[in-house]
A protein has these predicted regions:
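A short beta-strand-loop structural module common to alpha/beta enzyme folds
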Residues: 30-39
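Short glycine-enriched loops at secondary-structure junctions
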Residues: 7-11, 61-68, 115-117
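Active-site acidic/histidine proton-transfer and metal-coordination neighborhood
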Residues: 80-210
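Active-site loop/turn elements of alpha/beta-hydrolase fold enzymes
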Residues: 36, 62, 114-115, 185, ...
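Short, basic/glycine-rich phosphate-binding loops at helix/coil junctions
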Residues: 74-75, 140-146, 244-249
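Short hydrophobic interaction/assembly module
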Residues: 51-75
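Short acidic/His/Gly/Ser-rich catalytic and metal-binding motifs that mark active-site loops
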Residues: 66-73, 119-122, 252
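Histidine-acidic metal/acid-base catalytic patches
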Residues: 1-25, 40, 45, 51-56, ...
Length: 304
């Protein structure tokens, strides 16, 4: 089953019903994910469309709606991994609100970002080196290895904070019959890494959570030599509940329409469970025609 995320058009609409009708009318999607750029002002129109039976929702991407003090899409504005307990508490309460909206709109999933380790950024510097023709140069490898050592040394306390927050969020989601998708992240600094995620799922030990695979993020990590995309997906596929579908132009230009970049969808998609939810997450810069062509190719290869 395929759905479409409002991250493509929420920024250019002031009315939620018009935003949803653009996706339905121009792209033909009946099933929609409310992305992390949904302002509170869009909610009345969204609720109106839902109440009229004109739209169904696959999922909500935390935080949805945006906290009132945040003006633009910002899924990492509050983090479960934060040093200060006040920020962690704010992240939890905002996530509860997202879960409440998901329950109200009969959306079965909420997609979560979990936070990051406080360390010198490494992902973007590696991307810049790759773009400058220095991929896997001595400088590149030295920077990468140093970052891995620091991440492994310092990450545990941040991951523990995430676990403490997640337990509360899982309990709340269970009370609302909403499932949580823990998304793989673009940046090596972010939580969880692919090494951390299986044990995180094991420790939480809840049917309420599963893995949410972002094709673009995983491809960026493969392009930067952090993982093998197919090997990772093959290992985690049985625990995957949904995914964000997008392509990626080397090394890190993601949110492209499928079949426009270097993601080997023909090899990767069949690895996923038959009941996996596929949510298209497109850049606002992609045109309707580009997306339509991609949808047609997808349906020819993988069906509806």
């Amino acid at each position: 089953m395929i759905a479409f995320s409002t991250c493509w058009n929420s920024g250019r609409h002031n009315a939620g019903d018009k935003m949803l009708r653009e996706i339905k009318g121009k792209l033909g999607f009946e099933l929609i994910e409310l992305g992390h750029g949904i302002r509170i002002s869009l909610m009345p129109g969204i609720q109106k469309m839902f109440d009229a039976g004109e739209v169904r929702f696959s999922s909500l991407h935390n935080f949805c709606p945006l906290p009132v003090e945040v003006m633009a899409a910002s899924p990492d504005c509050y983090q479960f991994s934060a040093v200060y307990p006040q920020e962690r508490e704010r992240a939890i309460k905002q996530t509860f609100q997202t879960i409440d909206f998901a329950a109200r709109l009969s959306a079965p999933f909420v997609v979560l970002h979990l936070g990051a380790v406080n360390m010198k950024p490494i992902t973007d510097p590696l991307i810049e080196l790759a773009k400058a023709g220095k991929y896997l140069s001595r400088k590149y490898v030295r920077l990468k290895l140093s970052a891995v050592q620091k991440r492994e040394k310092n990450g545990a306390i941040y991951v523990q904070r995430v676990k403490d927050c997640l337990r509360r969020v899982i309990d709340y989601a269970a009370s609302k019959n909403v499932k949580l998708g823990l998304e793989n992240r673009r940046g090596y600094e972010e939580i969880p890494t692919e090494r951390e995620l299986p044990s995180l799922l094991d420790e939480m030990n809840s049917p309420q959570i599963g893995y949410w695979h972002d094709f673009g993020h995983a491809q960026i990590k493969e392009n930067l030599a952090f993982l093998d995309h197919a090997e990772w997906l093959r290992a985690i596929a049985p625990r995957t509940v949904g995914c964000h579908v997008q392509d990626c132009i080397w090394p890190a230009q993601d949110h492209q329409p499928p079949f426009a970049g270097g993601v080997d969808l023909e090899k990767l998609v069949p690895l996923l469970p038959s009941n996996c939810l596929f949510v298209w997450e497109m850049s606002p810069r992609k045109t309707t025609d580009e997306i339509r062509r991609s949808i047609q190719l997808w349906k020819e290869r993988f069906g509806e």
